[in-house]
From Swiss-Prot:
Belongs to the chemokine-like factor family. The chain crosses the membrane at residues 35-55, 69-89, 102-122, 132-152. It comes from Mus musculus (Mouse). This is CKLF-like MARVEL transmembrane domain-containing protein 7. Keywords: Chemotaxis, Cytokine, Membrane, Transmembrane, Transmembrane helix. It is found in: Membrane. The gene is Cmtm7.
């Protein structure tokens, strides 16, 4: 099995980021809320809020598991809201000292892992309590949406280069 030399390209699509040749139309980006990235962020925020409300309204069996799930869902929701507002109001142009694609990538990696762990923990602690079961289901759904957003935002494509000089 021979493996040829290959070129790995990674691309980051920031949804509503304007290119250098496109005109700016003020502070608010009117196109961003219609992009796939923005719609994924809104869906993630809604599912995280529903998961938080379901677990918060249930009777706590294990206080540590409830607290962990609540903290993870609220921190994840707040960070997604911050990234949504950064793209909506184009703060990435003003705050150039922060690498926004890298910080969003790290947030999605760490946040999705913690959300998945919290959903597993709360699902294992749900002893026929419908609030905890619903919270765990929405936690898993939010984890899936975060993974899908991560996959669609940071695509990795492998392109094999040809070895002939005429190309």
């Amino acid at each position: 099995m021979s493996h040829g030399s290959g070129l790995v390209r990674t691309t980051c699509s920031s949804g509503g980021a304007l290119g250098p040749g496109q005109p700016s139309e003020g502070l608010l980006d009117r196109v961003y809320p219609l992009t796939h990235g923005a719609l994924f962020k809104v869906a993630q925020m809604v599912t995280l809020l529903i998961a938080f409300i379901c677990v918060r309204s249930s009777v706590p069996i294990d206080y540590g598991a409830h607290s962990f799930f609540e903290v993870v869902t609220m921190c994840d929701l707040i960070m997604i809201l911050i990234f949504y507002l950064v793209h909506l109001f184009r703060f990435y142009r003003v705050l150039t000292c922060i690498s926004w694609p890298l910080s969003e990538l790290l947030h999605y990696l760490i946040g999705t892992l913690l959300l998945l762990i919290a959903s597993i923990v709360i699902a294992s602690k749900s002893y026929n309590q419908s609030g905890l079961v619903a919270g765990a289901i929405f936690g898993f759904l939010a984890s899936f949406l975060c993974l899908a957003s991560l996959w669609l935002s940071y695509k990795i494509t492998c392109i094999t280069q040809s070895s002939d000089a005429s190309a």
